[in-house]
Structures are given as structure tokens and as C-alpha cells.
């Protein structure tokens, strides 16, 4: 589920950037090719400005809502084990404790005194 949310988040971000770039600016840039200046276009005499503005607002709202949802999921995600590689620190501590128990006791003489 988390990966699906991230994928949707990235797709919405890319589409928002695309919609912002094709909107008609002061110089009628790329937005004019989508019906910004002609009345016989697919969007009608109003042009693409109204449609593109509404779509941008809708996707921006979805982007912010998805940000909150991903933040909420991510904050609760750390409490749940997902797979066998999630808790490697506990496994490392168990191995170190087992090595301390299994290690033979080596009698060491005072190594500070030269022989």
C-alpha cells in the first residue's frame, strides 16, 4: 500500500507540473495549442484556461491530501515488522550475546609485565 501511495504521489506531481507548464501565460505559450485562443476547439469558446485551472486545483488538493496520508502511514509504519530484514539490530545483538556465551574463557596473565 505504501509503494502504491508513493507511486500515485509521484504521478500526481508530474501531472501538476505538466498542467502548469501548458497553461496559457501572458505570451500564450504552450497553452494556446490546447484551445487557449480559438473558439472552435475541444474545450469550447471559453478555452482551456478554465479546464486547466480546475484540473490543477483538483490535483493540487489531491497532492496535499496524499501528503498527509503518506505522512500518517509512514509514522505508523515503523511499529509494524514488514519482513525478515527489518529488525537486523536485534539479530546482531543476539549474535553478539551468543558469541559471549559460547566463547571459551581464556586465562590471561597480566600482559603489562614483560616476560
Swiss-Prot record:
InterPro entries, per database record: SecG
Q: Where are the transmembrane segments?
A: 2-22, 51-71
Membrane topology type? Multi-pass membrane protein
One Gene Ontology BP term is: intracellular protein transmembrane transport
Localization per Swiss-Prot or TrEMBL: Cell inner membrane
The entry's keywords: Cell inner membrane, Cell membrane, Membrane, Protein transport, Translocation, Transmembrane, Transmembrane helix, Transport
Q: What GO terms fall under cellular component here?
A: plasma membrane
Just give the chief location class: membrane
Q: Name one GO molecular function term.
A: protein-transporting ATPase activity
Q: Per its UniProt record, what PANTHER family does this chain match?
A: PROTEIN-EXPORT MEMBRANE PROTEIN SECG (PTHR34182:SF1)
Q: Which family does it belong to?
A: Belongs to the SecG family.
What this chain does, per the record? Involved in protein export. Participates in an early event of protein translocation.
**Identification of the protein by name:** Protein-export membrane protein SecG
- Species assigned in the record: Pasteurella multocida (strain Pm70)
Supply the source organism's classification. Answer: Bacteria, Pseudomonadati, Pseudomonadota, Gammaproteobacteria, Pasteurellales
| Gene name of this polypeptide | secG
